[in-house]
Amino acid sequence: MGANPRGSVRACSLAVRACLRSFIDEAGVPSAFVVGLSGGADSLALAVTAIDVASRAGVDVVTVTVDHGLRVGSAQEARRVADLASRLGARALTVTVSVDGPGGPEASAREARIAALREVALREGGPVLLGHTMEDQAETVLLRLARGSGPSSLRAIAPIRRDEDGVTWLRPLLGLRRADTAGACEQVGLTPVEDPTNAIDGPWRAADGSALRRSAVRYGAIPALADALGMDPVPALARTAALCAADDDALTSWARALVAGEREQAANSADAAAHAADGPDGMARETLRDRAQDVASEVGAEVGEWASSLAVADVVGAPRAVRTRALREAARRGGIR
């Protein structure tokens, strides 16, 4: 690929380089970088640039291609993708999973795929890189808006996340477009796999027989928005996710300060979250105990000492968004997940 690639390859390479450098600066050099590789344009562009960038840092790349066993020929396709990754310089793995969980084939396949990637990451001792792009972010924001969501949900896909098992999930291409990943593949002469399950008329359907919701948003809602607004809505939707992430972080910081009893820090955080505050009437109507019961129901627990330990006057006087987060944080510190 060379030290100074051009065009779409350059855009992908710079994004991956910045992400991996940031990870190494914070966590140190890992044993390997694990890349989820379906063979589609996004994951293929990620893999080829990650292999190049990681090799310069002396770190192996392990690609994981998951065969869900849901299509005729999927096992052969997974092997072809793994063979390509091996030729590109990765240590290529294929994993066959069983898709039989609740929530339909799409959700079950996603959970099985995540579990497989997590297992490899824990074994290899490195983070997982995923090929989500700005379009994926925009689609997620729209899907969550349709459910009626607040900032915790509308922050959508996190560029970096550490899960409860200690695995770090990185999405270096979240600021790039699908045109960038497709262009990168074309530049380096790679032909991506076309997955028919992603098509609006693909074999996987929603429970009512209609297209899968994400496919409907991708091929229906976003083009319709572009036509109606006379503009590409994807960057604005992605920006909404970033703004909600900043708001959610501020509210969560305030809530944690309340739980820790750091009243002065909480007061200093008030300005950052003032736009989310309830009016006095709203505060009066909702008691801390009622909200604690709601949060307890969400996590499948009883209201106990974890709620009683809160400084009630401080928490009741906070905006609702902060109260909810304070209660969740108290539950977490009380050992409830």
Which sequence ranges carry the predicted segments?
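AMP-forming adenylation/ATP pyrophosphatase catalytic core
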Residues: A3-N4, A11-D42, V62, H68, ...
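Mid-to-C-terminal catalytic subdomains of enzymes
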Residues: A184, V188-A242, S269-A277, D281, ...
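Short helix-capping/linker segments at secondary-structure and domain boundaries
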Residues: A57, D227-D232, A331-R337
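Core alpha/beta nucleotide-donor-binding catalytic domains of modification enzymes
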Residues: M1-Y219
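Electropositive, surface-exposed helix/loop patches at the edges of structured domains
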Residues: G126-Q137, M231-A250
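Generic alpha-helical structural element
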Residues: P5, L130, A206, S210, ...
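Short, well-ordered alpha-helical segments in soluble proteins
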Residues: L145, S149, R161, G189-P192, ...
